């Protein structure tokens, strides 16, 4: 008699995805982040569900309802901080996952890569709307500034902004709809993640060498489940330390002041995980140009498969490309730092140089370096 997990209509799908899935023997811990992201999403949905039971999406009571969760609800403070810092862990895993894809050439699985870009956009939208919900100063002004960027779209911009706001400013209607979408989007992200996984399992995983490994596979369970559980334990340890020792480390103190439309904070900035894109937006003095640069800073990932000029898939044996990859990583860290600084000299010029470097490395220098490496290897 066949094993139930191989014959049951539902269990056999789970079995082929998580138990008997053939996986390259050489994949490293950099391949853990997919499962970590699913764990982060599960944590976010669960904590978010419990927060939504006590939260009220009304401008008059939203701030007080968050205070009530932290002070009066049993373990409300830990649920709230798990949710807030869980988002930071989500983005850390997300950026490392994308970085691994870039380094090892996983972007050549174009369907999986493009679904991944959609997932990134959906996650960023969810995080932005979630940041608005506590209705503190930075929530209100962040929502005002970021939604206002859409007014740069010719002809329809102003109407579009007022349509999103549900009025002539960020108000009750805006908060209510942001709460509705913030609740809905994680489930759309979960569905997209399933599609992402579906396309990945059509081709099988890439590996650090970038060489097809059809002849050298091992089952996902128990080998990679153990490895993934180790990664999960490490991530949960970091998240627990963050939540229990310094829960406000990554937040903004301005968000502990209730939203006041008559008082603008001295420095409006988003959460740390958007600062690199915010720095690119601010580095262009023109509004429409800034918005286009902001969108392209993420959308540039979609053209990377077309710019792959190397004869090798992975960067494992390409030292020049490796140097460029780490320069790009440093550039992103500089942009993140600049995004959190005030708009004054010398931060403006540093941001502009770093923004130009970001696009130049990805669109011009990396493809040319790959061609040079091909030539050096006489390919």
From Swiss-Prot:
A ubiquinone binds at residue 201. One of its GO terms (biological process) is mitochondrial electron transport, ubiquinol to cytochrome c. InterPro entries: Cyt_b/b6_C, Cyt_b/b6_C_sf, Cyt_b/b6_N, Cytb/b6-like_sf, Cytochrome_b, Cytochrome_b_C_euk/bac, Cytochrome_b_N_euk/bac, Di-haem_cyt_TM. Signal peptide: none annotated. The cytochrome bc1 complex contains 11 subunits: 3 respiratory subunits (MT-CYB, CYC1 and UQCRFS1), 2 core proteins (UQCRC1 and UQCRC2) and 6 low-molecular weight proteins (UQCRH/QCR6, UQCRB/QCR7, UQCRQ/QCR8, UQCR10/QCR9, UQCR11/QCR10 and a cleavage product of UQCRFS1). This cytochrome bc1 complex then forms a dimer. Belongs to the cytochrome b family. Heme 1 (or BL or b562) is low-potential and absorbs at about 562 nm, and heme 2 (or BH or b566) is high-potential and absorbs at about 566 nm. Component of the ubiquinol-cytochrome c reductase complex (complex III or cytochrome b-c1 complex) that is part of the mitochondrial respiratory chain. The b-c1 complex mediates electron transfer from ubiquinol to cytochrome c. Contributes to the generation of a proton gradient across the mitochondrial membrane that is then used for ATP synthesis. This is Cytochrome b. The lineage of its organism: Eukaryota, Metazoa, Chordata, Craniata, Vertebrata. The gene is MT-CYB.
């Amino acid at each position: 008699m066949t094993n139930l997990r191989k014959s049951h209509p539902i269990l056999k799908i789970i079995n082929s995805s998580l138990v008997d899935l053939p996986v390259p023997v050489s994949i490293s811990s950099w391949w853990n982040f997919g499962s970590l992201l699913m764990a982060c999403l599960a944590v976010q949905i669960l904590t978010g569900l419990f927060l939504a039971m006590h939260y009220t999406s009304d401008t008059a009571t939203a701030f007080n309802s968050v205070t009530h969760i932290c002070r009066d609800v049993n373990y409300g403070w830990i649920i709230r901080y798990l949710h807030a810092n869980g988002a930071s862990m989500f983005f850390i895993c997300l950026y490392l996952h994308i970085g691994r894809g870039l380094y090892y050439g996983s972007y050549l699985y174009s369907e999986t890569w493009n679904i991944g870009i959609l997932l990134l956009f959906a996650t960023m939208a969810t995080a932005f709307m979630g940041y608005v919900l506590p209705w503190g100063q930075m929530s209100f002004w962040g929502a005002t500034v970021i939604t206002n960027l859409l007014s740069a779209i010719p002809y329809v911009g102003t109407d579009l902004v007022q349509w999103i706001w549900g009025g002539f400013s960020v108000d009750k209607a805006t908060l209510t709809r942001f709460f509705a979408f913030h609740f809905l989007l994680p489930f759309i992200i979960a569905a997209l993640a399933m599609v992402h996984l579906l396309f990945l399992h059509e081709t099988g995983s890439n590996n650090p060498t970038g060489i097809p490994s059809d002849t050298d596979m091992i089952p996902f369970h128990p080998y990679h489940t153990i490895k993934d559980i180790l990664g999960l334990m490490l991530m949960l340890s970091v998240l627990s330390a963050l939540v229990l020792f310094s829960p406000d480390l990554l937040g903004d103190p301005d968000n502990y002041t209730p939203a006041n439309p008559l008082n603008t904070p001295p420095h409006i900035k988003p959460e740390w995980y958007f600062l690199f894109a915010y720095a690119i937006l601010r580095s262009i003095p023109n509004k429409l140009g800034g918005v286009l640069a902001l969108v392209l800073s993420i959308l540039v990932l979609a053209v990377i498969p077309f710019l792959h000029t190397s004869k090798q898939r992975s960067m494992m044996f390409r030292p020049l490309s490796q140097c460029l990859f780490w320069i790009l990583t440093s550039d992103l860290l500089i942009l993140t730092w600049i995004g959190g600084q005030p708009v004054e000299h010398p931060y403006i010029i540093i941001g502009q140089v770093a923004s130009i470097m970001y696009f130049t490395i990805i669109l011009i220098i990396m493809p040319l370096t790959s061609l040079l490496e091909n030539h050096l290897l006489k390919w």
